[in-house]
Amino acid sequence: MNIVFMGSPDFAVPGLEKLYNEPGITIKAVVTQPDRKKGRGHKLRPTPVKQMAHKLGLKVLQTDNINREEFITNLRDLSPEAIVVVAFGQKLGKKVLELPSYGCINLHASLLPRYRGASPIHRAIINGDKVTGVTTMYMDEGWDTGDIIYKKEVKINREDTAGTLHDKLASIGGDLLVKTLNDIEKGVAPREKQSEDKASYAYKIDRKIGELDWSRSSEDIFNLVRGVNPWPGAYTTWKGKLLKIWWVEPLKLTVTENDKKMEAGEVITASQEDGIIVKTGDDAVKIIELQLAGRKKITADKFVLGYNIKEGDKLG
């Protein structure tokens, strides 16, 4: 099968590699977003997909508008039987969608119709889900609303972060893409309409979502810290300074500790032996890793040793 692959970020790279290595699939070109200025030097940086495509010796096309007529002509000249889209970053119009004979196939990082939208991985962890997965679908003109081909469930472990889950889903999703294209070509791929009644949306997140509300439950705080790690990161304030929180563990307070009149966000314990324990809306969390603005990420015992944090201090 001759295909065009469209993708941009790290999530799309395993899929590109696995399709490239599949004997029955030929990638005629890779389409990705234009190079962007990044970092302190504001240097132009290629997308991760562009970097991998060059490594594999594949033809790369870049555009800021996939639906521009001259670009559609370029795509048509490639005669793709399918267009595979993984986190490309642009919405495909009707002319592009109708171009390949087998259609446009998308890989999405959730079990559709749950978590349509831009941030399904973050939302699954933040919401405390135990299971998520990946879905392949035939694309239509909506956002993640096309007919489902295959789904693959993936367990969310308590030690998972958005980063680790991202990598798992990207790899498993790459395998599912290979199966999907092979079965489409054989004429045995299923097709199922999405249930609008079960649909939910994972809207794009920004840095503000990482601000910790200590009045929430310990489990909610635990899930938020995991769900925004490594980006955009959970944070609070301490003595007027930004404090990033990289990992916490929920704790059950004893009856005696619960009898103390403590506010949410108050430091219950700050010692090298016990680390840093903070009151939450229902119990407490133990901070494992944290980072003061402009400093390195360190463990709680080292933070206690290096900074004057003490019982009764208020976070947030």
From Swiss-Prot:
Family from the record: Belongs to the Fmt family.
EC number: 2.1.2.9
Source superkingdom: Bacteria
Annotated (6S)-5,6,7,8-tetrahydrofolate binding sites: S110, L111, L112, P113
Gene name of the encoded protein: fmt
Organism: Halothermothrix orenii (strain H 168 / OCM 544 / DSM 9562)
UniProt keyword Plastid, yes or no: no
Alphabetized GO MF terms: methionyl-tRNA formyltransferase activity
Catalytic activity: L-methionyl-tRNA(fMet) + (6R)-10-formyltetrahydrofolate = N-formyl-L-methionyl-tRNA(fMet) + (6S)-5,6,7,8-tetrahydrofolate + H(+)
InterPro entries: Fmt, Formyl_trans_C, Formyl_transf_N, Formyl_transf_N_sf, Formyl_transferase-like_C_sf, Met-tRNA-FMT_C, Met-tRNA-FMT_N
Protein name: Methionyl-tRNA formyltransferase
Record keywords: Protein biosynthesis, Transferase
